[in-house]
A protein has these predicted regions:
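Aromatic-Pro/Gly-enriched surface loop or interdomain linker
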Residues: 20-72
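A glycine-rich, often tryptophan-bearing local segment used as a flexible ligand/cofactor-contacting loop or short
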Residues: 84-163
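Catalytic beta-strand/loop cores that center a nucleophilic Ser/Cys/Thr
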Residues: 147-221, 229-236
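Amphipathic alpha-helical scaffolding segments comprising HEAT/armadillo-like alpha-solenoid repeats
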Residues: 277-286, 308-320, 339-350, 373-376
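Short inter-helical turns and helix N-cap capping residues of alpha-solenoid HEAT/ARM repeat scaffolds
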Residues: 291-292, 322-323, 354-355
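Extracellular ligand-binding/catalytic regions of CAZymes and related secreted enzymes
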Residues: 23-27, 99, 126, 212, ...
Length: 376
């Protein structure tokens, strides 16, 4: 028994040593930036990796992959957007390079469209690397919003911060409805199951998304693949789940993130955008162009409360609105939604702010946002 215990300890140390030798001081993560990847999804994925003190992150293009950039990475992430368009942008030779990269012992994470790209879905351009296939693809535009999921036993090991919760909540945006592939013999493990029935748009049928895999994970050659049909990177308090997925693909130990980073209590209910909500959301675009300061602030309040998907693309310029009250509210929106992609904009806004009280308030919001990042 003692000999067996010593052997296990030695093998664990050897594995950790090999991991350390392979990546140096930091794990190198590449986020694919190509046609088909939504810009905000790319920004948010980068920001999520920045939460992990043991990781560095960069974007890579299809040309970078062809030029050998994968040799300088430990893991690749295919972000949200449009999976088939990313397939077209990558090209078949680059996708084979990615497959070989994973087979060699590296990691890959697919988020929403990226997870779709990884599937084996008939009639859809995909890579056949995660053992799942998407169904009901004719209703992909089924809707979006904060959605519930429950962890499986394996998922609780990977995300122990959520293990005692019956349900947790993250952003879902028309992700694939997954079942096991019947043509690719590649078993996967469901790490979480979706609990929300999303059918707000596109005449999508009811009872299609609920009780389906939310996160799946599988071996691929010597490497690993993790697929998320949802957007933790776009969910305040849950962004840390993305670097944790990367850790799983690389067989890295689970490490704790700060309480500022891990905050699942920000959302404790479903918030699905109805057709009426979407119409109201679209109207606020014009409010930010032509509305009064009071109207702009009311719009920001509503958009933040319903976790608007589109608002994050509109709020950046409000940091430099003519109204000090709007500038302060925009800073609070960015800080309270953990929107690290606009950190440099908030820093610039604080530097040029002339109103003393507004500047003090904006500086507090800036410090709140910066507290997400690990200490250097």
């Amino acid at each position: 028994m003692l000999r067996k215990t010593i052997f296990i300890i030695v093998m664990c140390l050897v594995g950790l040593s090999a991991w350390s030798r392979g990546v140096g001081n930091k794990v190198r993560v590449g986020v694919f930036q190509g046609n088909g990847g939504a810009q905000t999804c790319i920004w948010e994925t980068i920001a999520s990796i920045q939460l992990d003190p043991d990781m560095t992150v960069r974007t890579i293009t299809t040309g970078d992959i062809a030029n050998g950039a994968l040799s300088d990475l430990d893991a690749i992430i295919i972000p949200g957007g449009e999976g088939a368009t990313q397939y077209m942008n990558l090209g078949e030779e680059n996708m084979e390079r990615i497959r070989n990269f994973i087979r060699s012992g590296k990691g890959a994470v697919g988020i929403c469209a990226g997870a779709y790209l990884f599937t084996d879905t008939p009639g859809y351009a995909c890579m056949h690397i995660n053992g799942g296939k998407a169904i009901d693809i004719e209703h992909d535009n089924r809707g979006h919003g904060i959605s519930a999921f429950s962890l499986t036993a394996e998922g609780k090991k990977l995300f122990p911060e959520l293990a005692n919760r019956d349900r947790s909540y993250v952003m879902y945006y028309e992700g694939p409805v997954l079942v096991k592939s019947d043509s690719v013999p590649l078993p996967y493990t469901a790490m979480a199951m979706m609990e929300t029935d999303v059918h707000e748009e596109g005449n999508a049928p009811a009872n299609m998304t609920n009780n389906r895999p939310f996160f799946i994970a599988n071996e691929y050659g010597k490497g690993r693949v993790f697929s998320s049909i949802s957007h933790p990177e776009a969910t305040p308090g849950m962004m840390w789940m993305i670097p944790r997925m990367v850790r799983w693909t690389l067989r890295m130990p689970v490490v704790a993130y700060s309480k500022r980073v891990v905050n699942p209590d920000l959302y404790n209910r479903e918030i699905l955008m109805t057709k009426a909500d979407l119409k109201k959301e679209r109207g606020y675009y014009n409010t930010f162009l032509y509305g009064s300061p009071k109207e702009k602030i009311a719009a920001l309040d509503w958009l933040q409360n319903c976790r608007s998907w589109d608002a994050k693309r509109w709020v950046q310029g409000l940091l430099f609105d003519n109204s000090p009250a709007v500038r302060e509210r925009a800073a609070r929106f960015i800080a309270e939604t953990d929107y690290l992609p606009f950190l440099s904009d908030l820093e610039a806004a604080c530097r040029v702010e002339r109103n003393v009280q507004t500047k003090q308030s904006m500086m507090r919001h800036l410090e709140h946002l910066k507290a997400l990042l690990p200490h250097k």
